Amino acid sequence: MSEHTAVLRRFNRTYTQRIGVLDESFLGTGFPLGVSRLLFEIGPSGATVRDLRERLDLDSGYLTRLLRRLGDDGLVDVRPDPDDRRRRLVSLTARGRTAWRRLDDRSEDLARSIVDPLTERKRDRLTEALQTADLLVRAATIHLRTVEPTDPAGVEAVGHYFAELDRRFPTGFDAGEGAHDAESMASGAGAFVVATSDGRPVACGGVQQVRPGVGEVKRMWVHPEWRGAGLGSRMLRHLEAEAARLGHRRVVLDTNATLVEAISMYERAGYSPTERYNENPYAQAWFEKVLKGPGSRRSTSRA
């Protein structure tokens, strides 16, 4: 057991015991934590079954059983979406809203019981430490899924990426310049990967073929709030694995000189400068990396 895992496991044991995770009735709600968490996640605004499944990462059958329990107690109502009857909407009943407010109040009381004994300085330290821990854990555990470039989450992520380039490039950015990339990253030809949190995209990236044996990393983007937590490096490694799976022995990429944090990440990941290999009008630096592992072999040829 490493020191890192030992500290994390000790914290898990301490915290779960302190907040009553093992109690049959979490915070005196009459429900265990799983049911209470679902009730809280539905909230006054309601949610779709699909959103709840994705937010809580629950198996469909298990989520159905939890919703049935809340429904049997008169706390939630599940009905088809009038705008799309393939979707199901979940909303709180009047009794459910009362239960939700009680759960929210007791959760706040529990949190206060932890922070109130601390001095103001130590509260600030705890808040900063928890914010950092929350971001790092989410970045390390978020699911990276391969989708078609036309997937709604992927389209939204690329839209954020293009908007950021337009803001940061001195000359702006014309999204039409990369319109053909989506087709070349479709399954079979390439790969496109997206990461979502609470139903919203927080990172994306793709791989397309430059020529046989050489893949290109494209559209690498991480939401600003998630930067500095290692998600970009994790996405890059994932894309390299996708490139190897597609049979590429080497990957290349281009970038703009204004994206200094991206250039730093590429250099730390083992990328080396190479000559220009495309006609991208926004590219000012080009990099390459020889892949190692299954599906690849060492190659010294250049782009």
Protein language model features and the residues they cover:
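Terminal interaction helix/tail motif
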Residues: D105-R145, P149, F287-K289
